[in-house]
Amino acid sequence: MTRRYWNINLEEMMEAGVHFGHGIKKWNPRMAPYIYANRKGIHITNLTKTARFLAEACDLVFDAASRGGQFLIVGTKKQAAALVARAAIKARCHYVNKKWLGGMLTNWSTTETRLHQFRDLRTEQKTGRLNRLPKRDAAILKRQLSHLQTYLGGIKYMTGLPDILIILDQQEEYTALRECITLGIPTICLIDTDCDPDLADLPIPANDDAMASIRLILNKLVFAICEGRSSSIRNP
């Protein structure tokens, strides 16, 4: 994997609060190698290590994108939902930003069936066929469509398992992480000071609560994906 320059600087990360961890009572001892200090009862993440792992993650997604790889971004915190959707759409990635439905990946055949149903209902709505049904039947199908849009809208074009998952909160998205471990799908994970870095294939030590921190990390990864996709077009 070729190393590239991704304009990752420590000052920018400090301004975004990437270095702020959780209180010292709420920590995972396995995070010790990534913790720089304890300030007023708060663990401070070592940003030099964050920068190194983030650069590695950018290299990884660039290479995968240049080969046509598919990415799934997972971040279901309410305050991050819009950010996740915008970033994923920009980089032509799939995303889950509401609730992770158990078995979404490990029971892919069921997910695929739901996606087919979702596409059929969207087609019926676009062609006006839903409005020609009896009101009761139309109302039931519209509710189904709304439900599917909420939970599967970000993966509606996904035709198979993704090549890499980008997980923005290890604790919040633990079910998704376990499914990836079961299936052997590589994961890039933001890990705060209360997380287990050993569960992620490529952990990025960072504040996973502050929107500025999440935005900075996600924007770097999305930029690398976009660059990788452009590279594949320039060098087919």
Curated annotation (Swiss-Prot):
<dbReference type="InterPro" id="IPR023591">
    <property type="entry name" value="Ribosomal_uS2_flav_dom_sf"/>
</dbReference>
<keyword id="KW-0934">Plastid</keyword>
<dbReference type="InterPro" id="IPR018130">
    <property type="entry name" value="Ribosomal_uS2_CS"/>
</dbReference>
<keyword id="KW-0689">Ribosomal protein</keyword>
<keyword id="KW-0687">Ribonucleoprotein</keyword>
<dbReference type="GO" id="GO:0003735">
    <property type="term" value="F:structural constituent of ribosome"/>
</dbReference>
<dbReference type="GO" id="GO:0005763">
    <property type="term" value="C:mitochondrial small ribosomal subunit"/>
</dbReference>
<dbReference type="InterPro" id="IPR005706">
    <property type="entry name" value="Ribosomal_uS2_bac/mit/plastid"/>
</dbReference>
<dbReference type="Pfam" id="PF00318">
    <property type="entry name" value="Ribosomal_S2"/>
</dbReference>
<protein>
    <recommendedName>
        <fullName>Small ribosomal subunit protein uS2c</fullName>
    </recommendedName>
</protein>
<dbReference type="GO" id="GO:0006412">
    <property type="term" value="P:translation"/>
</dbReference>
<comment type="similarity">
    <text>Belongs to the universal ribosomal protein uS2 family.</text>
</comment>
<keyword id="KW-0150">Chloroplast</keyword>
<dbReference type="InterPro" id="IPR001865">
    <property type="entry name" value="Ribosomal_uS2"/>
</dbReference>
<dbReference type="GO" id="GO:0009507">
    <property type="term" value="C:chloroplast"/>
</dbReference>
